[in-house]
Amino acid sequence: MSSQVVGIEPLYIKAEPASPDSPKGSSETETEPPVALAPGPAPTRCLPGHKEEEDGEGAGPGEQGGGKLVLSSLPKRLCLVCGDVASGYHYGVASCEACKAFFKRTIQGSIEYSCPASNECEITKRRRKACQACRFTKCLRVGMLKEGVRLDRVRGGRQKYKRRPEVDPLPFPGSFPAGPLAVAGGPRKTAPVNALVSHLLVVEPEKLYAMPDPAGPDGHLPAVATLCDLFDREIVVTISWAKSIPGFSSLSLSDQMSVLQSVWMEVLVLGVAQRSLPLQDELAFAEDLVLDEEGARAAGLGELGAVLLQLVRRLQALRLEREEYVLLKALALANSDSVHIEDAEAVEQLREALHEALLEYEAGRAGPGGGAERRRAGRLLLTLPLLRQTAGKVLAHFYGVKLEGKVPMHKLFLEMLEAMMD
């Protein structure tokens, strides 16, 4: 794998915050030009009944269930707030200049709005100025990030902010004091969870929605395009999540890039497996995209359904808990085998801290006894080779899709694919 990917700049990793819909993982400011939209045919989003208006304002799907994902031959995206043509990715979301400016004014002015109706006003290109309260709510719902707006109004600088203000920074390296936290799932006693685990639980990304088009054309290409769009957004979220892990941001930029380029698919695949744990022989690629093995094959994924379900069943047999999942996910990140890492000692230090946190959690879960926590931790760690093998098969499949050239892919997803297969 090459240590450099054409087109990936420090902005992908260093700029904050990230959003599910931004291929850069960064917020735009008034001193930065809009991010160039991916060339070629790209998935666009619209609402049923959407009409283009001469005012530059329309309808967008930000909410679950209301949006439709359709393929278009037009090389452009729509604003997720109002449906107008998006000028770029602003504050983490594909949006038009008008909604970008509205969101910025609202945050900088600390403006509070009140809906004159029932807080359910339709936000379209023509009606977006009718209710500012519902428009602002829509901005937040589709993922616009308040932290991306500079409050000081000073041009040329970058505001300092915390991604999650409720989370105190954790020391790294250092001790992570234990504290009680109720463990979900079963009438088991409370397990002590150290501060690192608590931090990982808090910074765990919110749910993503694929927004597939139920009325779309038959065939597997639209489904594969939906997954490519979903993966592109998940990469952005993964970059933001990785930066929230104590010790990762202290790595050099090149090492951050090398680590992420080598394990991003493992993180995504583990997320699919975790969402699928409550299901029976089904895969939850997103909250609104669940496929069984036959459905995955019909969607153009070949035998990936069976491959992914093998991993899911392994984790189901372990009765993987959420605390264990967030630790395993962080360990998968730190378990990078990239030969381009410059400071291997720093990455090893991160890996050791996460391993110790896993042992501490399992010790509290098992209670006093003869090494049960180490056996449990060992069984969890033994899933990492299967995870890597599974991710490799998923990568190979989508790289083949890329070579066929029939499915539109966004720039970041393409670059990360090429970095892995180079």
Swiss-Prot record:
The modification N6-acetyllysine is found at K129, K138, K160, K162. Residues 1-67 are annotated as: Disordered. One of its GO terms (molecular function) is zinc ion binding. Residues 58-67 have a biased composition (Gly residues). The keyword Membrane does not apply. A zinc finger (NR C4-type) spans 79-99, 115-134. GO terms for cellular component: chromatin; cytoplasm; nucleus. GO terms for biological process: regulation of DNA-templated transcription; regulation of transcription by RNA polymerase II. Residues 192-420 form the NR LBD domain. The modification Phosphoserine is found at S19, S22. InterPro entries: Est_rcpt/est-rel_rcp (IPR024178), NHR-like_dom_sf (IPR035500), Nucl_hrmn_rcpt_lig-bd (IPR000536), Nuclear_hormone_rcpt_NR3 (IPR050200), Nuclear_hrmn_rcpt (IPR001723), Oest-rel_rcp (IPR027289), Znf_hrmn_rcpt (IPR001628), Znf_NHR/GATA (IPR013088). Keywords: Acetylation, Cytoplasm, DNA-binding, Isopeptide bond, Metal-binding, Nucleus, Phosphoprotein, Receptor, Transcription, Transcription regulation, Ubl conjugation, Zinc, Zinc-finger. Phosphorylation on Ser-19 enhances sumoylation on Lys-14 increasing repression of transcriptional activity. Sumoylated with SUMO2. Main site is Lys-14 which is enhanced by phosphorylation on Ser-19, cofactor activation, and by interaction with PIAS4. Sumoylation enhances repression of transcriptional activity, but has no effect on subcellular location nor on DNA binding. There is a cross-link at K189, K402 (Glycyl lysine isopeptide (Lys-Gly) (interchain with G-Cter in SUMO2)). Gene3D superfamilies: Erythroid Transcription Factor GATA-1, subunit A, Retinoid X Receptor. It comes from the Eukaryota. Its main location: nucleus. Residues 76-151 bind DNA. Belongs to the nuclear hormone receptor family. NR3 subfamily. Binds to an ERR-alpha response element (ERRE) containing a single consensus half-site, 5'-TNAAGGTCA-3'. Can bind to the medium-chain acyl coenzyme A dehydrogenase (MCAD) response element NRRE-1 and may act as an important regulator of MCAD promoter. May function as a modulator of the estrogen signaling pathway in the uterus. Induces the expression of PERM1 in the skeletal muscle. PANTHER family: KNIRPS-RELATED PROTEIN-RELATED. Binds DNA as a monomer or a homodimer. Interacts (via the AF2 domain) with coactivator PPARGC1A (via the L3 motif); the interaction greatly enhances transcriptional activity of genes involved in energy metabolism. Interacts with PIAS4; the interaction enhances sumoylation. Interacts with MAPK15; promotes re-localization of ESRRA to the cytoplasm through a XPO1-dependent mechanism then inhibits ESRRA transcriptional activity. This is Steroid hormone receptor ERR1. The gene is ESRRA.
